Amino acid sequence: MSQPILVFDSGIGGLSVLAEIRKLLPHHNYCYLFDNARLPYGELEEQELISGCVALIDQVVERTHAAIVVVACNTASTVVLPALRATLSIPVVGVVPAIKPAAQLSKSKRIGLLATPGTVKRHYTYELISQFADDCHVELFGSSELVLMAEQKIATGQLDMARLAQVLSPIVEADLDVLVLGCTHFPMLRDELQQVLGKGVTLLDSGEAIAKRVKTLLAETKSEQQVQEDANRDSVMQAFYTKAEISEGLASMLVDCGFSTLERITTINSNR
């Protein structure tokens, strides 16, 4: 098996990023690693987040011989990337909230960032706003509940729209024309978010930009012959999780997505 692309997240949100990468690289092999034992990441202390993520990703990279790692989690990307890059010898791609394109797209210059509490409070987020949206009024909204709602939707096919409307009410009242989805779970709720917020609010995420970056990096590290060989073989997809068990609904969804292997990875702090 050729070296896979390893996509990592705390839960199923990173599947939205993996889907964008597969559009550009449909024949590549993929590993999806989700640390659902510690979900949601937005409520973890910084050092706990760093040490756990680095140990887990390093373990799976060594096992799968991954060619590249995509940290498809905004919360983890804001704090884990330096330590991860210092540990691994392969390229590591993180997620950056789409603040810059949001500022460029906004006509009212009133934009919002919807993310986890962890991402909202990071200094990195404020640096992005200062650098790319200095001419905009930017509202920040942090929610861990939306992460769990996205997980529930995928696992059960159900979503409490009344509760979603309550969670989003501060955003509705903020009178924005562009909202950045600063958590990879949130594109899973795109249709429902749009329904509550209305067509006057444009929703932006970073999935497409990440996919283009991954394709560029792989092209730099592979020969033309290797690229051609990848294009001529069927894609193999493996999923790894850290919780003791996953629901039948989630397992069924992963199989429907094309994953041929679902396996629990035992690591520190994974007994929840």
UniProtKB/Swiss-Prot annotation:
SUPFAM superfamilies on file: Aspartate/glutamate racemase
Pathway: Cell wall biogenesis; peptidoglycan biosynthesis
Annotated keywords: Cell shape, Cell wall biogenesis/degradation, Isomerase, Peptidoglycan synthesis
Reaction equation(s) it catalyzes: L-glutamate = D-glutamate
Domain of life assignment: Bacteria
EC assignment: 5.1.1.3
An MF annotation (GO) of this entry: glutamate racemase activity
Disulfide bonds: none
Annotated positions binding substrate: D9, S10, Y41, G42, N74, T75, T184, H185
Keyword presence, Transport: no
InterPro entries with a match to the protein in the record: Asp/Glu/hydantoin_racemase, Asp/Glu_race, Asp/Glu_racemase_AS_1, Asp/Glu_racemase_AS_2, Glu_race
Active site: residue positions: C73, C183
Family in the record: Belongs to the aspartate/glutamate racemases family.
Record protein name field: Glutamate racemase
Lineage, highest ranks first: Bacteria, Pseudomonadati, Pseudomonadota, Gammaproteobacteria, Alteromonadales
